[in-house]
Amino acid sequence: LEFRRVLFRSEIFADRFSLDYIQLHGNESPEYCHSLRATGLRLIKAFSIARRKDFENIGTYEESCDYFLFDTKCEQHGGSGNQFDWSMLNSYKGKKPFLLSGGINPYSPPTLKELRHPQLAGFDLNSRFETKPGLKDVERLRHFLEELRK
């Protein structure tokens, strides 16, 4: 019963706010993700990365999510603003496209442009692009995107 209640709330929330994707940062199982996706929701499943071994069990989510998000492992869910060793991305051999998160800042474009993983689909920009929690600095984002496109 609890699962159905959470599933129903997720659908209503996504519909009410016209969300294109839902990003999951918890301990959701592949089955739970599959059930959410079966309702028509598109999912980004976040994985905490601290070492190469952290990529080993990600494959069980391949069929239940639309994208993966690789973020720095930390105590709390949702990110720390710190960067993990991005050279470890070479350990990811899956076919699911992923977004990179964790420690990306306005000065990251030169380093990000050097990343050549075939499944890298984009970047998750958060706290370092905000003037206050939840409010993006449009000028900072514009500058970042210009630098990334150079």
Language model regions located:
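Short, acidic/turn-prone active-site loops that include or flank metal/cofactor-
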Residues: 26, 48-52, 73-75, 126-134
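Short, small-residue-biased leader/transition segments that mark boundaries at the very start
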Residues: 1-7
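C-terminal helical cap(s) of enzyme catalytic domains, especially alpha/beta-barrels
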Residues: 36, 113, 126, 130-150
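Catalytic cores of alpha/beta
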Residues: 8-20, 24, 30-33, 50-65, ...
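Short Gly/Pro-enriched loop/turn and capping motifs at secondary-structure junctions
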Residues: 74-75, 97, 104-109, 130
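Short beta-strand/loop segments at the ligand-binding rim of alpha/beta enzyme cores
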Residues: 37-50, 94-101
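Short beta-strand elements of ligand-binding domains
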Residues: 4, 23-25, 45-46, 100
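Active-site rim beta-loop-alpha module in soluble metabolic enzymes
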Residues: 72-84
